[in-house]
């Protein structure tokens, strides 16, 4: 009863307006050497869930992290989680995602008196909503558009994995400065029909 009472009141602890919530986030990465320092299998697993209260709409796309690597967070999609899906394409009260890639350093060379290497990282990403966000409201709004061909609020489809395939090229100087070029494609056209691409710095994780 004590735990139930605490969870029931957690939304009003901060502002009494229903914009407080208690959440849980787990993100773990693992790197497995396959062949010397030339080939590495790397993967990252993330789970984020809402325990109590209600997440405000303007915070629903936030992925919590202890180590700030990106300027912004964007739900599952874009360049910070599931590469190849439209930015903010998959959001919910709770989300889970997996990034898996092979990192192959295939060329070493010296240039301007610095050590460089080139690397490829073919990857497979996937994610899924594990807690829906205001699903009842989406269903209610869908009834108002029941006579339209494509419903903008609720498709009626059961949530499933959103997966992508892609590859990246890395130009690395002295092992600590990384220029990254990545391209990916969603395996379901509803997650994005065009080829996704991104130019930036560092590996994703």
Residue ranges: model-predicted function:
Residues 21-25, 95-99, 162-166, 176, ...:
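Transmembrane beta-barrel architecture of outer-membrane proteins
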Residues 119-165:
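Outer-membrane beta-barrel transmembrane domain signature
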Residues 23, 58-68, 136-144, 196-202:
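Flexible, surface-exposed loop regions and adjacent strand-edge segments
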Residues 171, 176, 193-205:
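Outer-membrane beta-barrel "beta-signal"
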Residues 1-114, 130-132, 151:
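C-terminal outer-membrane beta-barrel translocator/porin domains of Gram-negative envelope proteins
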Residues 30-32, 102-106, 171-173, 183-185, ...:
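Residue-level signature of outer-membrane beta-barrel architecture
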Residues 121-123, 175-184:
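Conserved active-site loop/cleft motifs that coordinate metal ions or position small ligands
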């Amino acid at each position: 009863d004590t735990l139930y009472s605490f969870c029931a009141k957690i939304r009003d602890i901060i502002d009494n307006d229903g914009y407080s919530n208690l959440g849980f986030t787990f993100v773990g990465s693992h790197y497995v050497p396959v062949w010397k320092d030339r080939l590495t299998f790397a993967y990252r697993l993330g789970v984020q869930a809402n325990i109590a209260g209600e997440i405000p709409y303007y915070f629903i796309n936030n992925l919590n992290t202890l180590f700030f690597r990106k300027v912004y967070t964007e739900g599952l999609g874009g360049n910070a989680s599931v590469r190849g899906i439209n930015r903010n394409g998959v959001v919910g009260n709770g989300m889970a995602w997996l990034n898996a890639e092979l990192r192959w350093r295939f060329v070493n060379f010296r240039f301007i008196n610095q050590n460089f290497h080139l690397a490829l990282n073919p990857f497979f990403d996937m994610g899924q909503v594990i807690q829906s966000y205001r699903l009842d409201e989406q269903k209610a709004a869908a009834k108002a558009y029941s006579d339209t061909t494509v419903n903008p609020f609720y498709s009626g489809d059961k949530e499933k994995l959103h997966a992508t395939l892609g590859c990246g090229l890395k130009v690395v100087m002295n092992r600590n400065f990384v220029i990254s070029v990545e391209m990916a494609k969603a395996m379901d056209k509803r997650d994005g029909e065009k080829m996704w691409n991104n130019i930036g710095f560092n590996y994703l994780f």
